[in-house]
C-alpha cells in the first residue's frame, strides 16, 4: 500500500528546538516515540506531528507515547501544570516554547480568511458543476474526473495540508451525488447506496474491533511473551529468527502492529548500525508476507474474505508456501551480505526490559484467542466475521473490567481508554474510499474497465502480478476494492487462482518500496531510514522474494501439488 511522505508542516528547523527520540526500554511497546522531523502518512495524514497510518490500526505511535511516557523520559523538565492527576504528561507538553513562539509570530488572521473563502468558493463551484446538465448526460466521465481529483488529493495530502480522511469522505459523497443524478431514478441510486454501505460497514466494524483488541493486549505488554523469548545474538541467526517471528505474528495481527513490536525489539537487541537497519527491512518484508496467507493478517485479504472471494482454509493452504518463499528468498540473499556476516552482538549492549502489566499473560491469551476464533465463529454460525470480532471484544471488555475492578490507577488498561487511542480517522478514510469505489461499481465503470483488461490482457496472472507492483506505489485498498468491483464471483469463483493471487500480490507487493506499505512507513519513521537507502539495500531482495513467491504459487498449482493438511497425507509417515 503506497504512502507518499511529501513535505512537512513543522516550523523551520532552525527555529525549533531539536527533540531527541525517546527510546523506550521495552522491546515491544507500540508507543515508541518516532522522530518528529520525519513526516509520513499512509492512509490518514496528520500535519504537525509524526504519525503512523494503516487503515484500521493507524495513528498510534505518536499518541500513545503521550499517555505512556513519564515526565522523566524527556530531555527537558516539564511544567507540573501540564500534568494530570496521575502524573502523566498532557498532550500540550509536546508543544515547546520555540514552536509556540513561531506560531504566534506567524499567525495571520487575514490568511485564514482567504483560505476559508477559497474553500467556500470551491464548494460553491463544485455544487454548481454537479447540478449542471452535462453531469447527468456524461455521468461516467464526471465520476472518473471526480475520483481522479480526489485520489490525487489523497496522494498529495502532505503537500496540500489536507487530511486524506476528509478528502475521502468528500469524494465518496460527491460521487454518490453524481450517481443519483445520472441514475435512471433516485430510488435505484438509494438502493445501490444501501447495498454498498452494508458491505463496507462489515469491514469497518471488523477493523474497529480488531484494532481495539490489539490495543488492549499492547496496553498490558502482552507481546513481551513473544519478544522476550528471542535471546540469540548471532547476526545471521537473529536475521532468520526475527524474520519468521514477524511472519507468524503478522499472520494474526496487522502488519503495522507487528512491525512496531519487532522494530522495538531489535532496537533493544542491536545498537544503531547498518545491520540494525537491515533487520528492520527484514521486518517489513516478513510483516507483509505474513499477512498475505491468512484472512485476518492484512486488510486486503480481510476484504476479500468478508466479501466471499476467498475462504479460510483454502487460502491458508494455498498461500502459505508462496508467502514463506517470498520471505525465505530475501533472508537467504541477505545472509550473504557483509552486514549480516559481522561479529556477534555483545550482551552488555542489550537494553533492560520493562515489566509486563498485571494479568498481561491472561489478556494476551484471551486477545489472541479472540482473533484466531473469528474464522471458527464464521464457520460454525455462518454469520459475518465482524460478529465474531465483536464477540471477542465483548469478552475481553468484560474480562478487563473484572480483573481491574477497583483499580483506579489502571484505567488506561481498560477498553474505554483503548477506544480513545485507536485511530477512528483511519476507519473513516476506509469508509470513504470504499464507498467511492462502490459508486464506480454501481455506475458500471469498473465493469467497463474489466472488459477492457480482458480484451487486452487475457492473462489473469499478469493482471494480479501488475496489481502487486502498482500497490508499492498506490494505495492497495482502492486497488483491491476496484478489482473486486471489476470481477464478480461468476467471472472468477471463490478461491480461484485469480483471487488468491490478488490476495498474495497486493499483500506482498508493498515491500518493494519503503512507502509501499504501512509496515515500511513505520520502519522509516522509527529508524530514520530514507527512501533511497531502502531502495538500494532492501528493494532488490523484496522484489526477488515477490517474484519467487508468485513462481512458487504457479508451480504448485500447475503441478497440482498439495500441501499435506493431515498426518495421513505425509508420505514418509504412511509408508507410501
Curated annotation (Swiss-Prot):
Mostly expressed in mature and senescent leaves, and, to a lower extent, in seeds, roots, shoots, flowers and developing siliques. Its main location: plastid. Keywords: Antiport, Chloroplast, Ion transport, Membrane, Plastid, Sodium, Sodium transport, Transit peptide, Transmembrane, Transmembrane helix, Transport. GO terms for cellular component: chloroplast envelope; chloroplast membrane. Signal peptide: none annotated. The chain crosses the membrane at residues 237-257, 279-299, 320-340, 357-377, 379-399, 426-446, 462-482, 501-521, 541-561. Disruption phenotype: Decreased biomasses and lower chlorophyll levels after sodium feeding. Increased Na(+) levels in chloroplasts in high sodium chloride conditions but impaired photosynthetic performance. Altered levels of phenylalanine and tyrosine. It is a multi-pass membrane protein. Residues 1-60 form a transit peptide. It is found in: Plastid, Chloroplast membrane; Plastid, Chloroplast envelope. GO terms for biological process: pyruvate transport; response to salt stress; sodium ion transport. One of its GO terms (molecular function) is antiporter activity. InterPro entries: Cit_transptr-like_dom (IPR004680), NhaD-like (IPR045016). Belongs to the NhaD Na(+)/H(+) (TC 2.A.62) antiporter family. Na(+)/H(+) antiporter that extrudes sodium in exchange for external protons. This is Sodium/proton antiporter 1.
